């Protein structure tokens, strides 16, 4: 089955005014694609890890006034949710698509994971591809490009994950609407797969 992935025009959904109107546009235009990606890559991650992965499409159910500025599908080994676990994400902001692995503030494994990352700090600095980015807040689009970080910068972000209650750490790639215009469905799916391959060693560190 051929999955219809994102188009460059899908980013325009975040220009729709109003909570109900934007949510309707997201549910109509974006969620079916996230569902399809969820099915495919939950199976992919399950095969790669020998664990059962489940996908979770963001519902934005807590929003009562402000419309969402991003949306995503997340992958975890818990059928009921993902926020409490290290997890993968595929999603969209108005400015870019993203493919991430990370831990957000609800995850109780942050301290143990930070210690594991620090033990392999030099490996992370060397093995994470230069064009990958790091986020310390999943609710904001701003990131730090891996190739611009010194080892000490990476160390500080990881240490913060262990010491700050609301700290988060995600890593992966961004794809701009312009890049999407030049990509086929097959190229995008291959990009997701190669990105997840690069991130799976971090997942392994979380579960050693």
Swiss-Prot record:
InterPro entries with a match to the protein in the record: UPF0637, UPF0637_domain_sf
Family assignment from sequence similarity: Belongs to the UPF0637 family.
Pfam families, sorted: DUF1054
Residues passing through the membrane, by range: none
Source species, domain of life: Bacteria
Species per Swiss-Prot/TrEMBL record: Bacillus cereus (strain ATCC 14579 / DSM 31 / CCUG 7414 / JCM 2152 / NBRC 15305 / NCIMB 9373 / NCTC 2599 / NRRL B-3711)
The protein's name: UPF0637 protein BC_3960
